[in-house]
């Protein structure tokens, strides 16, 4: 049904520094669905996530993107976040001098302000933060640490899932969030993503590898190659990619 559609992309083309990366992407995501986007290096997977998040270095040259019936491309990056889009980065950045507590307090209250809500009271914020840190098995002392400074790869990714839990997005875009994770960290990150998923939300999981999709099972799998989606199927496509590779699909 049309009212179940969260995200609708039609004919999306995008460039960076005059080089066309996305060459006509069509994609529809409905409430409750998890979509995996797979493909070789340079296919345009991270460009797609960056365009959806509104990164300014990417120029959309054609196509439309609607999120909950609104023109996503007309929104600023902040407005997209307030509307319910969350992007997990492949390489989370360090923010020296800013504690996780202060960072999240600013982010949560900015989201609330964007929706016309009052800032959370200090006690309510700290209670929410403790709950979500326990949810992703993050030690309480991390709240006092500077954002991602000195964190291992797994700790950075766990911190991102914690941020996602705090912001409670409608559409989560996970851009190669499995990069550099050992098996234990992968399980924790995946369990957090699965636990946050509800019938009213959706997720786009961008990955090279089958192993993440053993834990976050997709409803739909797309192969993005040379800027276009060349194949779409169910979760069985993951095993086909593992067996044949991208060139033989």
Predicted regions and their residues:
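ABC ATPase NBD Q-loop/coupling interface
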Residues: 64-80, 148
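The feature captures the beta-strand-to-loop junction immediately N-terminal to the Walker
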Residues: 38-43
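Conserved structural motif at the start of ABC-family nucleotide-binding domains
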Residues: 7-9, 22-24
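Conserved beta-strand-loop-alpha-helix hinge in the C-terminal portion
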Residues: 220, 224, 228-249
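ABC-family P-loop ATPase nucleotide-binding domains
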Residues: 93-170
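Walker B catalytic motif
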Residues: 173-177, 184
